[in-house]
Each structure stands twice: as C-alpha cells, then as structure tokens.
C-alpha cells in the first residue's frame, strides 16, 4: 500500500523534497501532511515555516518563489498547495494568471531546505497535460484513492497498533461491514473502540456491534436483503430506525433505487462471466461495493429486480404528486419489495 510505505519512510526521517498527493480520500492526504509536519518541524517552527496556498487565490509562480526562499530560523520549511487543479481537466473561474512553466525547473532542482506538498484532491487527473507528466516523473506520488477491502483491513491493523488496541481479522471485517471504507469514519470508530476497551485491550465482536453505527449504505444493503427475502418486519424496523436517525425518506428511496440498479447491473455482468475486477472498472464502483453486490445477487431474480425499480418509480411519482405522504410511501414500497420476493415468474 503506497501511502503506508511513505508514512513509514517519513517517520524514519526519510523525507522527500516534493510530494504530489492526488485523489479523493481526505484522510490519506491529511495524514501525509501531518506526518511531514511532525517529522520536519517542531511546533514552534511550524508557526513561521509552514505556508499554505490555494491556486484559486495565488499565482503559481509566486508560490514557487516562496518555495525557493530559505526558512526562517529553522533548517526546514513546508509549502503546501491545496488545490492543484492545473493537473486536471477541471475548469476554474479564477482570473489569476498561472505561469505553469515556473514549476518544471523547481521540480528538477528543488530547494533542499523546502518540502513542497502539491495536492490535487480530485478523482481524475488529465494524463495528457505536460504538467501532470512532470509531476508524476519528478515528485514522490501518493494516490489518495479508495482502498480495496484487503488494503482497508491492513490499514485498520496499522491504526489499531497506533491506538494500542488488539483487533482480530474477523472483527476488522465486521467493522468495515458496519462503517464502510471511509477512512475518516473508520478512524473515528476505532478511537471509540479504544475508549471502550482501553489501551492494551482487545476489541471484541460484541463491542463493535454495540458501539459502531451502521452507515446509511450498509443499512440500505440490509434493508433490501431482508425485503427481498420476505423478512418484512426486519426491513420495516430498519427503515424506521433510519428515519429516527433523521435520514430523509426520499434520500432513502433514492439510495434503494441506486442499490437495486447496482444489483441489476452486477447480475447481468455476472451472467456474462465478467469478473468482479472487470465490473469495478465498468461500473466505476468501489471494489467492496461490487463484492457485496455479487454476493447478494445470487439469491435475487433479474425480473424481480426490474419490477422493484419500476415500483420505486411509481413510489417517487406518488410522493412528488402529493398522492402519498413520503414516509408512508417509502414504507409501503419496502413492503412491496417483500411481496415481490414471493412472486413467481414464468
């Protein structure tokens, strides 16, 4: 896992002059920045020797000039560019004139006293751009992307070691099932578990089930599975619990439809012998989402899935035309999902 290797290098004081962090996983980006700061400057030095810039506010050439300036009463300084959209196809409304050519000579010969961190918190880079190629060639690149299930389990182990708690592999997997793969959320849940078990303690399956709240996505998974299996009482109870948590019924309906469509797509691709890896690329979904869907669709009939999506459209229409109150309408739709599970098709 690329970023964990870089974290370990930084903690050994092996700090590179320029880092290029790109991707949407905010926790990875923040942890990289925090580790660089902690292992480069003392708290007192950080006040005078950490500069943060946004391209939307400051010309790139001025940021490079700052990077080329010696630190103030310190052996090191850190310069951070927060939103490097120049490496993407994203348009920006700013009228600031960026001299992109000022970056190349600096990347080839960075100031030894400066650590430059360039952040592109976007899903995709524009690989055709010269600046993107320069960054990928002349910097230490860390892709802050969603982790696979295996990588997430490994990451939980690293975080558990830092927190001084013991988490067995089955408990790690349960944690991911409940909290999802968002690292910020997982770190928060692990911290909660540490407070419960104490430093040096073991986090049990019972503790995770008791302490960790399901994500909305996981609740949707469970709700559909219970409904399609005819376990209506459990499905309705799940829905009412989501409403008690202040989840908007229309949002729940939208997510139900999204999940049903994912199931339908995965079902069709599975029948055509596509692998889960191929499905991830085609559907642009997280590998963990595809893995769960592939496991669940085994017991789902394709015609029932299509009928369920049509029933959801009818429910949405009834709500938006004022024919049915939204909470009642979504609950009725969940009951209909259960009815579909018992219907036979020729």
Regions found by a protein language model. Name each.
Residues 1-346:
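Conserved beta/loop motifs at nucleotide-recognition and modification sites
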